[in-house]
Amino acid sequence: MEFAAFADRAEELAAEPADIGTTRLVTDLLGAAGGTDENDDDLATVTRFLLGRVFPAHDTRTLDVGPALCREAIARAAGPNVTADDVEDRLAEEGEIGAVAAGFEFGGQRGLAAFGEGRDRLTVAAVDAELRRLAAAAGDGSESHKRDALFGLFNRCEPAEAKVIARLVLGEMRLGVGEGAVRDAIAEAFLAGNPEGDERDESDTDDDPILRAGDEAVVAVERALQVTNDYGRVAVLARDEGLNGLRAEGLAVGRPVQAMLAQAGTATDAVEAFGEVAVETKFDGARVQVHYVPESAAEGDDAAGGTELGPRIYSRNMDDVTDALPEVVEYVEARVSVPVILDGEVVAVDDDGDPLPFQEVLRRFRRKHDVDRMREEVGLRLHAFDCLHADGEDLLDEPFRARHDRLAEVLSDAAASVEFAGDPAAIEAAEAAALGAGHEGVMLKNPEAAYTPGNRGRDWLKRKPDVETLDAVVVGAEWGEGRRAELFGTFLLGVRAGDDELATIGKVATGLTDEELADLTERLEPHVVSEDGTEIEIRPEVVLEVGYEEIQTSPTYSSGYALRFPRFVGVRDDKSVDDADSLERVVRLAGDEK
């Protein structure tokens, strides 16, 4: 597929206001990208590009291209009379990098036009290959290599293509295409009238894409997405193997999946919903997923691919944090003798084994050097509480009670303990014991519930804390004053308000030490989009936990709400922008306070 064709469809999608219209456009695009077997790579790539990704969500590779590098590449491709400062000035006017890139005539266009010749057309496959080479650049000179590679792409671009590439490399596609729309489009494009992967028959299809594909097809696509975390792979599976292929797809050890999440609730809520309640300690730690294939067991497990895999530890964001957590690796190696995928929490502990604050855990997660020294200062302990795969068997569809029993088997009875209670008083007693031991409280789970990756449902409840906090995204900043003049001093916060959208909810400047301000400034500077005086626009990448006294309605911020007396609690390194709190939760919390 020519990249210009993809760019044109992207422009249509960005202008499409209706959800059903979006699904139809995505369906048509996937059909065009995956119409023949020769287009396998294009189908997978186009599906990922639609969601602003070059790699599957579980893949730890990144492009590692910041706004400044992108501006420099655009300036170079635009010609000798254009500087990075010129690009930044245009960015201040346009407000987003795609429009800026589309506004320049790049070198390749000018040269070919002078000779009256056409140019070698970019293809989707060529762009994907170049971006993958760019991601592979590492070590000395890697920044220069990335700049050269990006310049080469821009130099071959027409305006619409440049807009998409600039947005793609910075993770700012802004097409208004959510994961749900892509899921539904995969079902419609390849499963409507084609449930088993045979020749399609479109003679008796309805106009509604969801009805045409059918709930069964959408469920099968969703399930395959849960176990693969790869929209490109699932699109190809749906086209080539139909429902049977999607249903046959399982977990793979070494390929992390999204964590199942909890909603807030009370003991009474849990008893009324579940009857008997599984009560677990809620640890003040960082969520992890453990993948391990012992050498002795590799060949007998299809999910292991027949190869040994030393323990790999993945964060909630599916980042590989194995090297920072050697004691977790040792813990797993000492106890597990079969291939497993475990869900759990890593907690910081002192010399006596008592829990330390959450921020101590994050000090270890971020550590790439001097790990042994940090290990002496802050110890870690794994509390595994769920088992998704064991010894060749996927357990997602098994009830929690059975999964926990399997967990106890594979961990030699070292699994996190669970109690079963049938009344609120027993739950409150368990919570008091957990709090007395220095933990965060309790989790309340439906003993009969399956494990649904990425789902925040009512089968897992976390007891409401006495003081609420919000996980909000940094979308802007202001320079400090006085001795803090060279540091960001105030941070503009946003919450999720829809697909690819964030709504501002307030600014936080209280509760930060000089050291924390310096750390945040260092983290955020590579993501600066533009500056206007003391105000700075920042690409959303960093999530902060903030406390507050109350939530008020306010016309000042785009959410319609403002945090009263916000205070910094900590950086949530374990959370991505997609894990930040939603405007829906803000509205609910504001209502609860009235």
From Swiss-Prot:
Q: Which family does the record claim for this protein? A: Belongs to the ATP-dependent DNA ligase family.
What does the protein in this record do? DNA ligase that seals nicks in double-stranded DNA during DNA replication, DNA recombination and DNA repair.
Catalytic residue list? K282
Q: What is its EC number?
A: 6.5.1.1
One GO term (biological process): cell division
Q: Which residues bind ATP?
A: E280, R287, R316, E345, F385, R456, K462
User: Which residues does UniProt call coiled coil?
Assistant: none
Q: Which domain of life is it from?
A: Archaea
Protein encoded by which gene: lig
Kindly state which keywords UniProt assigns to this record, in alphabetical order: ATP-binding, Cell cycle, Cell division, DNA damage, DNA recombination, DNA repair, DNA replication, Ligase, Magnesium, Metal-binding, Nucleotide-binding
Provide the cofactor list for this protein: Mg(2+)
Q: Which NCBIfam families match?
A: dnl1 (TIGR00574), LigA_Halo (NF041331)
Under InterPro entries, the record lists: ATP-dep_DNA_ligase (IPR050191), DNA_ligae_ATP-dep_bac/arc (IPR022865), DNA_ligase_ATP-dep (IPR000977), DNA_ligase_ATP-dep_C (IPR012309), DNA_ligase_ATP-dep_cent (IPR012310), DNA_ligase_ATP-dep_CS (IPR016059), DNA_ligase_ATP-dep_N (IPR012308), DNA_ligase_N_sf (IPR036599)
> What name does UniProt use for this protein?
DNA ligase
Family matches, as Pfam families: DNA_ligase_A_C, DNA_ligase_A_M, DNA_ligase_A_N
- Catalytic activity annotated for this protein? ATP + (deoxyribonucleotide)n-3'-hydroxyl + 5'-phospho-(deoxyribonucleotide)m = (deoxyribonucleotide)n+m + AMP + diphosphate
Upper taxonomic classification of the species? Answer: Archaea, Methanobacteriati, Methanobacteriota, Stenosarchaea group, Halobacteria
Q: Cite a single GO MF annotation.
A: ATP binding
